[in-house]
From Swiss-Prot:
The gene is ispF. It comes from the Bacteria. InterPro entries: MECDP_synthase, MECDP_synthase_CS, MECDP_synthase_sf. This is 2-C-methyl-D-erythritol 2,4-cyclodiphosphate synthase. GO terms for biological process: isopentenyl diphosphate biosynthetic process, methylerythritol 4-phosphate pathway; terpenoid biosynthetic process. It comes from Symbiobacterium thermophilum (strain DSM 24528 / JCM 14929 / IAM 14863 / T). Its EC number is 4.6.1.12. A divalent metal cation binds at residues 8, 10, 42. Keywords: Isoprene biosynthesis, Lyase, Metal-binding. Homotrimer. Pfam families: YgbB (PF02542). NCBIfam families: ispF. The keyword Repeat does not apply. 4-CDP-2-C-methyl-D-erythritol 2-phosphate binds at residues 8-10, 34-35, 56-58, 132-135, 139, 142.
């Protein structure tokens, strides 16, 4: 078994939907990015790719490529799972931490776990999603952005 780690951060801006863990969350601001800017899934994809030694999401889905403009990160995650399968790997579990002052994501975690688990091909109980604040410190504390960390375990080969 192999383990990978991922991190992502995006700026909060008005006029964009807020998508975290594949779930749209009501908010006056969303995350700025080339795709839907889902920091939770971006961190997870980097963790999965890193575990398999396959680089990072910027390598596979460059922000300069118009093909990925506005992409749904659940679709990108499906592609990452496909890349793992081509190399003989499969996801086992993942653990994601979202760092944001608001909104509170607790009510949305069950849906996130279901959606991510379905794409990874694992039971939702194998998908851990936690949230914390930055205690009003730094860019996250000033509510300028949201960050996420992820670890993922893969098996195979």
């Amino acid at each position: 078994m192999l383990i990978g780690f991922g991190y992502d951060v995006h700026r909060l801006v008005p006029g964009r939907p807020l998508v975290l863990g594949g779930v749209e969350i009501p908010s006056k601001r969303g995350l700025e990015g080339h795709s839907d800017a889902d920091v939770a899934l971006h961190a997870l994809m980097d963790a999965l790719l890193g575990a398999a030694g396959l680089g990072d999401i910027g390598t596979h889905f460059p922000p300069t490529d118009p093909a990925w403009a506005g992409a749904n990160s659940l679709d990108l995650l499906r592609r990452v799972v496909g890349l793992l399968a081509e190399e003989g790997y499969r996801p086992v579990n993942c653990d994601i931490t979202v760092v944001a002052e608001r909104p509170k994501i607790g009510p949305y975690v069950p849906a996130m776990r279901e959606r991510i688990g379905a794409v990874l091909g694992v039971e939702p109980r194998r998908v851990s999603i936690k949230a914390t604040t930055n205690e009003q410190m730094g860019f996250v504390g000033r509510e300028e952005g949201i960050a996420a960390y992820a670890v993922a375990l893969i098996a195979g080969r």
